[in-house]
Amino acid sequence: MGLENVPAGKALPDDIYVVIEIPANSDPIKYEVDKESGSLFVDRFMSTAMFYPANYGYVNHTLSSDGDPVDVLVPTPYPLQPGSVIRCRPVGVLKMTDEAGGDAKVVAVPHTKLTKEYDHIKDVNDLPALLKAQIQHFFESYKALEVGKWVKVEGWGDVNEARQEILDSFERAKK
């Protein structure tokens, strides 16, 4: 089964499937799954010496305002393999804009059936303060050395804003 056949989730927006493109703490390489072939491509080598503070991926069958599927960060006890799919629930969203427009990053934790470690996290403010700071710092800085690219972080949104981002992106993709 190709990645294009992975559903958006079991019960949107609270129970989603995230296709992982970049493992947490990996080398500074931006990977993207080609939505037509399902292949994992190297998008670019990041100019900054930074790594993603959580696993990074997307929800299939969604379309964010930047024209890509909704982006999701997933903290886990261990880095996940690119191309793997993880069942999650959203807890918040980092609101930001870049040179291509709105570029929100949903933060989601693994579903309770995978691990009980995140059961106490109901909202982004329940995440460790250091992890939130690392995520924000990463996205404020990761394009700093790339000519013509920029990012403006506008702050954090709660679980309800994350849920709405997922629903809006799912509806946008159906049009």
From Swiss-Prot:
Record-listed E.C. numbers: 3.6.1.1
Cofactors (names): Mg(2+)
Keyword entries, A-Z: Cytoplasm, Hydrolase, Magnesium, Metal-binding
Compartments (UniProt record): Cytoplasm
CDD domains, sorted: pyrophosphatase (cd00412)
GO BP term, pick one: phosphate-containing compound metabolic process
Binding site residues for substrate: K30, R44, Y56, Y142
Catalysis: reaction(s): diphosphate + H2O = 2 phosphate + H(+)
Leading EC class: hydrolase
Amino acids binding Mg(2+) 2: D71
GO molecular function: inorganic diphosphate phosphatase activity; magnesium ion binding
PROSITE patterns, per database record: PPASE
Residues reported to bind Mg(2+) 1: D66, D71, D103
InterPro entries named in the record: Pyrophosphatase, Pyrophosphatase_sf
Highest taxon of source: Bacteria
A Pfam family reported for this protein in Swiss-Prot or TrEMBL: Pyrophosphatase
Family designation: Belongs to the PPase family.
Known partners and oligomeric status: Homohexamer.
Job of this protein: Catalyzes the hydrolysis of inorganic pyrophosphate (PPi) forming two phosphate ions.
Protein name per its UniProtKB record: Inorganic pyrophosphatase
